[in-house]
Amino acid sequence: MYLKLLEEAGRLMKQAVADAGYTVEDMSLVESQHADVSSSLPFRLAKELKKNPKEIAAAIVEKMGKSEYIDRVEATGAYINFYASQKYITDSLKEILSEKKFFELEPNGIKVILEHTSANPTGPLHVGRGRNPIIGDTLARLLRAGGYDLEVQYYVDDMGKQEATIVWGYDHLDRIKPGKPDTDKPDHEIVEVYRAATDLRKSDEAVEKEISEILNAYEHMDPATAVKFREMVERCLEGQKMTLARMNVFYDRFVWESDFVRDGSVNKAVKKLAESQYATTKDGALALDLSSFGMDKEFVLTRADGTSLYTTRDIAFHVWKLARCDRAINVLGEDQKLAMQRLNAALSILGEKKAPTIVFYSFVSLPEGRMSTRKGVVVNLDDLLDEAVERAYVEVDKRRKDIPEEKKRQIAEAVGIGAVRFDIVRVAPEKSITFKWETALDFEKQGAPFIQYAHARCCSILEKAKPGEYDASMLREPEEAALVKKIAMMPYVIKNASTELKPHVIAIYARELAEAFNQFYRVSPVLIAEPELKEARLALVEASRKALAASLGMLGIAAIEEM
């Protein structure tokens, strides 16, 4: 409904601007803290026409027409402010409650491939890069709600030297002494084998040679070697998928790096790049001179023995991917910026007209306690999730002595996982983040538990009384109108967040929505109100429940009914 309000404000504004004698296309309409819709157009016109912006604003408002959704329009200084009418409130509540897909935009026909996480299959996911699946999955949920035809991909790096090291390690377990993981998850077992084999590789040239031979055999698709690689990588992926599923992160397709070697795509790309004017060779290795693209270092494509590198195979993957979508989006750590510049240059040399859109993120750090990342120790994401759930359990147990133990554990799991997801996604991806327990598990205002609690409160009210026929005109308190307006804004928020690829925007909105509901709840008793008013407020509680559930859903957080 807010999109309709913007449309109405734009229609009135365009006519008034023309009637006032100005010629402008962009009306500069935005949401505002001081009004329902605001325009700063007078500032822009004042700069162009060398006139007083306040006088321009007054002249435009004087010509303003009428709309059933707009109660009044005011010139406040140089701003033009629009205020929604009661009919807008009434119609918004009706549409929120009656429209099953109110929180989804119409399909736009744009095919998007979103790739995220794509961690090396060498062990468990760790906290530093734990931001990737959370950002990626939130973007996926936003893009789907935004009407995009989306496929979420995980690119499986199954051909690197790290993977060859693990294959060698499993073949020579009698020569290495892997540590014993404190869990049955296969990715934790894999990393112990990898560490032990790596230590031996560094100290024994013969081992290094054997690992190189294994990698070479795999690149040339030796059947027996290929089976070993696939088994090892799938085993590690199994453990990583368990972690991701626990965080409500899922994928449509796992794309294997080796497939692009097997089907000749890598050789085809290398051949074409080798024939380009940018190709150079040194000691048998093929590289690209990218100085004309503003990069000093050469981009190495193959080793001296002719085997390809990860970056080469990544080029073939992107050629394949770009041919299958209108837009490709990658979620990557900020340390990959140079690699992506080189990739885009190579794609340009190959004649690609499109390039992937990259959402870069800064890494997550843990500042205190036994899980501190400042000590240079890699902290597994599994450990962070376990810690979050245990801390959440303490809070739940403190508040709910009346419920069974199993129920407490279920709530703690939902609250703990939600706390991690929300605290990581609430900050813009490009900004660094320090994970703090006191913020993440804040039941009062800052964290996901605050939003989950608002949803649970809605469910508790609705369990006692179901909404029936209602008269929305009974909702006259400012907090009631503010809550309806906040709910009605969600499609607008989805549109902006999905278009601009800003997952933190929906997190901020969800928290503001929970706050708006709490403000309403504080001033507007529901169950003890007079019958007609009670029905109207119950309808608003149901609308709030739907909106809170939808916003939590887009954040990948469980909308629990009891806390």
Swiss-Prot record:
A motif ('HIGH' region) lies at residues 119-129. The keyword ATP-binding applies. It is found in: Cytoplasm. GO terms for cellular component: cytoplasm. It holds the Pfam family Arg_tRNA_synt_N. Its EC number is 6.1.1.19. It catalyses: tRNA(Arg) + L-arginine + ATP = L-arginyl-tRNA(Arg) + AMP + diphosphate. CDD domains: Anticodon_Ia_Arg, ArgRS_core. NCBIfam families: argS. PANTHER family: ARGININE--TRNA LIGASE, CYTOPLASMIC (PTHR11956:SF5), ARGINYL-TRNA SYNTHETASE (PTHR11956). Belongs to the class-I aminoacyl-tRNA synthetase family. This is Arginine--tRNA ligase. It comes from Methanocella arvoryzae (strain DSM 22066 / NBRC 105507 / MRE50). The gene is argS.
